[in-house]
Design a protein with these regions (language model features):
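Bacterial Sec-dependent signal peptides at the C-terminal "C-region" and cleavage site
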Residues: 8-21
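Residue-level hotspots at or immediately adjacent to binding/recognition sites across diverse folds
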Residues: 19-342
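Positively charged n-region of N-terminal signal peptides that target proteins for export
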Residues: 1-4
Length: 342
C-alpha cells in the first residue's frame, strides 16, 4: 500500500475588497469532491475522486492532501465520508468497493471493508453516534446494500435482505453529495431515485424499515431525490430534480413536518432547478442552502422562497457547527464563504 502526501501544494485565492464583503476562499484541487465533513470551526476534511482525500486544521489557510491507494493497487473514487468518535471514514463507491478510516487528524488509511461484487455501488454514509453508522448502496441480487458498524467503523456487516424493503424496478440512489442518507438519533432516512423515488425510514437504528412514496419528479434514471437534510426528528427537506433537465424547478423540493411519514411539495415553479445538495443552518431553523452544478441558492423561510446567490458550480455544501462558515466543493474546487452570505 502506498499513500502519496501533499502539504500546502494547493492554490489558495482570497477575495473580498471591502470590510463588509464575506471572506472568500477558493482552493484548487486535483480531484472532484462530492463529500465534505466539517469536524469543527476550523477543521474540514474532503473525500474525492481517484483516491484523493484532504484536510485543513486552520480554516483553509493550509491543507494536507493524500492520494490513497487500496491494497489491490486501485485508487478508489470516494463519494461518501463521515466521522466517528476517533476516526474519519471514506467510502469508495464502485467495485471493488472499499471503506477506509484514519484517526481524526491523520492522513494514513486503515482499510476496513472490501467487496468485489461487480454490481456493488455505495452511495452514502451516515453516523448515528460515535460508534454506529450505516452505508447505503444500490441493489445487488435484488436487494439494497446496507452496511452497518457498531464499533466505530472497525468492522462492517451487511444487513440481511429480508430486513429491508425490496427495491422497485429501476430504483437506485445517487452518489451525488453524500446526501441521500440522514439521521436524527436512532431515526434514519434513506432516499432513492430513478424510475421510483421513495423515503425509507427506520426509527430503531436500521433494524426495521417503512417505505414512503414521494411526490417528487421520478420515472427516468436521473430523477428523484439527490439530497436531504433534517433539523430535528420531525422537520426535514428532500431535494433533487431532473439531472438531465436542470432548469426544471417543479417536483424537486419536498418538506416533511412529521418525521417523513408525509411529504408536501414546496416552491413549485419558484425555486431553483436541479440541486445535488441541500443543508439547513445549524442555528437558524428556517435557513437553507442548496447547491449544484448550476449554482447556489438560499432560503430564509424554510424553503418557501429562494434567492439565487451565484452561478458558481459545486456538488456539495456543509455548514460549520457554529454556522458561521459555509463550505462548498465540486469539480477540482473547494470554496469557503462566511455566513450570512453577501
Amino acid at each position: 500500500m502506498r499513500t502519496f502526501l501533499l502539504s500546502l501544494l494547493v492554490t489558495l485565492t482570497w477575495s473580498g475588497c471591502q470590510p463588509s464583503d464575506p471572506a472568500l476562499l477558493h482552493v484548487d484541487l486535483p480531484c472532484s469532491v462530492r463529500s465534505l465533513d466539517v469536524l469543527g470551526p476550523e477543521h474540514v476534511r474532503f473525500a474525492g475522486s481517484n483516491g484523493w482525500v484532504g484536510q485543513t486544521l486552520d480554516g483553509g489557510a493550509t491543507w494536507d492532501m493524500a492520494q490513497w491507494m487500496a491494497p489491490d493497487g486501485t485508487h478508489p473514487s470516494f463519494r461518501a465520508s463521515g466521522h466517528s468518535s476517533n476516526h474519519w471514514h471514506a467510502v469508495g463507491i464502485a467495485s471493488p468497493a472499499w471503506i477506509a478510516r484514519t484517526s481524526t487528524t491523520s492522513m494514513a488509511p486503515e482499510w476496513t471493508y472490501h467487496n468485489t461484487d461487480s454490481a456493488m455501488f455505495l452511495d452514502a454514509m451516515v453516523w448515528m453516534d460515535g460508534n454506529r453508522a450505516l452505508v447505503f448502496g444500490d441493489a445487488t441480487g435484488g436487494c439494497f446494500t446496507l452496511l452497518i458498524t457498531q464499533d466505530g467503523g472497525a468492522h462492517w456487516e451487511r444487513v440481511p435482505c429480508d430486513l429491508l424493503p425490496a427495491p422497485w424496478e429501476g430504483e437506485a440512489a445517487f452518489a451525488a453529495s453524500n446526501g441521500n442518507l440522514a439521521c436524527q438519533g436512532d431515526t434514519v432516512w434513506i432516499f432513492t431515485g430513478g424510475l421510483a423515488s421513495r423515503c425509507l425510514r427506520s426509527v430503531d437504528a436500521g433494524r426495521t424499515w417503512t417505505s414512503i412514496d414521494l411526490p417528487v419528479v421520478q420515472g427516468s434514471s436521473m430523477t428523484g431525490v439527490f439530497s436531504a437534510t433534517f433539523r430535528n426528528a420531525r422537520h426535514g427537506w428532500a431535494m433533487g430534480g431532473n439531472w438531465e433537465v436542470p432548469e426544471d424547478n417543479e417536483g424537486n423540493l419536498a418538506v416533511t413536518n412529521d418525521g417523513g411519514t408525509t411529504w408536501q411539495m414546496l416552491a413549485e415553479g419558484r425555486g431553483p432547478g436541479y440541486r445535488s445538495s441541500i443543508v439547513h443552518h445549524p442555528t437558524q431553523p428556517r435557513s437553507l442552502v442548496a447547491t449544484g452544478f448550476d449554482g447556489l441558492d438560499v432560503s430564509f423561510d424554510g424553503g418557501h422562497s429562494w434567492a439565487h446567490h451565484s452561478d458558481s458550480s459545486h456538488y456539495v455544501a456543509r455548514f460549520s457547527p457554529d454556522g458561521r462558515t459555509l463550505w462548498l466543493a465540486g469539480a477540482k474546487r473547494l470554496t469557503r464563504l462566511d455566513w450570512p452570505l453577501q
